[in-house]
Amino acid sequence: MRWFYSTNHKDIGTLYFILGVWAGMVGAGMSLLIRIELSQPGAFLGSDQLYNTIVTAHXFVMIFFLVMPVFIGGFGNWLLPLMLGAPDMAFPRLNNMSFWLLPPSLILLVSSAAVEKGAGTGWTVYPPLASNLAHAGPSVDLAIFSLHLAGASSILGAINFITTVINMRWSGLRLERIPLFVWAVLITVVLLLLSLPVLAGAITMLLTDRNLNTSFFDPAGGGDPILYQHLFWFFGHPEVYILILPGFGAISHIVSHYTAKLEPFGALGMIYAMLGIAVLGFIVWAHHMFTVGLDVDTRAYFTAVTMIIAVPTGIKVFSWLATIHGSKIKYETPVLWALGFIFLFTTGGLTGIILSNSSLDIILHDTYYVVAHFHYVLSMGAVFAIFAAFTHWFPLLTGLTLHHRWANAQFFLMFLGVNTTFFPQHFLGLSGMPRRYSDYPDAFMKWNVVSSFGSLLSFVALMLFIFILWEAFASQRSVISSPHMSSALEWSDPILPLDFHNLSETGIITYPK
């Protein structure tokens, strides 16, 4: 029962991890179904609607039930109080509620796919396809309610994290000195707090359009489906930065830890870069809508500002490289993930720069080029960062160590798998293969076969990861000590795993005058 009503940040963080791992398996299973369908021309599932329902559910599960719970809920809950020297989160019971809103939300999402014909709208849920005309029945409504719950969970969590960071720091721990992961999560939850209400408004209007005969998005009643797209992407674009920013913070910690440095190169610049990304992230949303007939000045503006986001992102990438430069790096598993992250995230960023050109995007929009782009930054950005953070902080969370050689092998297998899956999709997109179709002309077969083979490699790597987890718990190799630098506050308690309540009183940090 302790897990149900726990108000302890470590317990709740662990619950988020369990939910995230489980949902990650579900989402990975869906992605395998997608790749099996596309592994050869002709039908496998036999229905485009079913295929699109799987695509929709895959996306929602991976975004709202894997990346966000693990990074913000799992690592955020576990590490923020430790890095700030706080005894717990500011609102422990609210924290508990934030977690317990997620399982019902996940159940609603799975139900939406299971009842009637499912929500085959894609994760963007655009009307008129999502209207009661094209999607009669309760499926889309269930998906909307699922999003409402997940959004409420995130907003409550955001309030909690913001309050914790502002009020519960060690005396003397000035804002510019708090660790980069704390900054990353703080900026992330501010983005959540500002963008989720807009999504809630959009999907509530969609709900009333579907059930109460309003016409927010129906031209017949004076509405406009483009309004929905503007509202959705005003949330959707900050959302993709919400997914990656905690990863930035984690990678900063890992890179400086394994290069034996007290802090990453240009730590203050890193904070400003994240702030810059956060601000710019709110004013570029229409680059997802270059094909809907925006006028030329609007397209020019969104192209230009989207390209400007590359500047703070580039600052971060080069600062990580500068941190690594000249150091005697210890090639342990988290470093491999971090280096893989830097390389592949940069690749995804470059395809993003290409897509930010409105003229090119009109050709590439809704092709597999876009799929390849965002899977490079998510599947090899956010997910690699999760693996890096998990392998790095696993001894802190459990007091146990992972099997070194197997963890390394799992990285190389996963690296091979995701690249084999997603690199060929750039070629498919450039040849004009569209997204969200369950079948394709024979001309596209070669690269689809390669891509589907890569997905099997990734799946084996995932199973190997689950085995490595089991092996670590089964073997019980305890941590003796941590080789951390004095600036890494979360490791400062000498006894691992950390006690249920590790801080009986808060500390004080003094500075030389």
Curated annotation (Swiss-Prot):
Tell me which residues bind Fe(II)-heme a.
58, 375
Chain sites annotated for binding Mg(2+): 365-366
Work out whether the entry's keyword set contains Electron transport: yes
> Which cofactors are named for this entry?
heme; Cu cation
Chain sites annotated for binding O2:
241
Q: Which SUPFAM superfamilies match?
A: Cytochrome c oxidase subunit I-like
Q: What is its EC number?
A: 7.1.1.9
Residues given in the record as Cu cation binding sites: 237, 287-288
Pathway info: Energy metabolism; oxidative phosphorylation
Keyword annotations? Calcium, Copper, Electron transport, Heme, Iron, Magnesium, Membrane, Metal-binding, Mitochondrion, Mitochondrion inner membrane, Respiratory chain, Translocase, Transmembrane, Transmembrane helix, Transport
Annotated Ca(2+) binding lies at: 37, 42
Q: Where does heme a3 bind?
A: 373
What residue intervals traverse the membrane? 14-34, 60-80, 96-116, 142-162, 180-200, 231-251, 265-285, 304-324, 335-355, 377-397, 411-431, 453-473
**What reaction(s) does this enzyme catalyze?**
4 Fe(II)-[cytochrome c] + O2 + 8 H(+)(in) = 4 Fe(III)-[cytochrome c] + 2 H2O + 4 H(+)(out)
**What's a GO cellular component annotated to this UniProt protein?**
mitochondrial inner membrane
Gene Ontology molecular functions? cytochrome-c oxidase activity; heme binding; metal ion binding
One record GO biological process = electron transport coupled proton transport
1'-histidyl-3'-tyrosine (His-Tyr) crosslink residues = 237-241
Q: How does it assemble?
A: Component of the cytochrome c oxidase (complex IV, CIV), a multisubunit enzyme composed of a catalytic core of 3 subunits and several supernumerary subunits. The complex exists as a monomer or a dimer and forms supercomplexes (SCs) in the inner mitochondrial membrane with ubiquinol-cytochrome c oxidoreductase (cytochrome b-c1 complex, complex III, CIII).
Similarity-based family: Belongs to the heme-copper respiratory oxidase family.
Query: What's the stated role of this polypeptide?
Result: Component of the cytochrome c oxidase, the last enzyme in the mitochondrial electron transport chain which drives oxidative phosphorylation. The respiratory chain contains 3 multisubunit complexes succinate dehydrogenase (complex II, CII), ubiquinol-cytochrome c oxidoreductase (cytochrome b-c1 complex, complex III, CIII) and cytochrome c oxidase (complex IV, CIV), that cooperate to transfer electrons derived from NADH and succinate to molecular oxygen, creating an electrochemical gradient over the inner membrane that drives transmembrane transport and the ATP synthase.
Stated name of the protein: Cytochrome c oxidase subunit 1
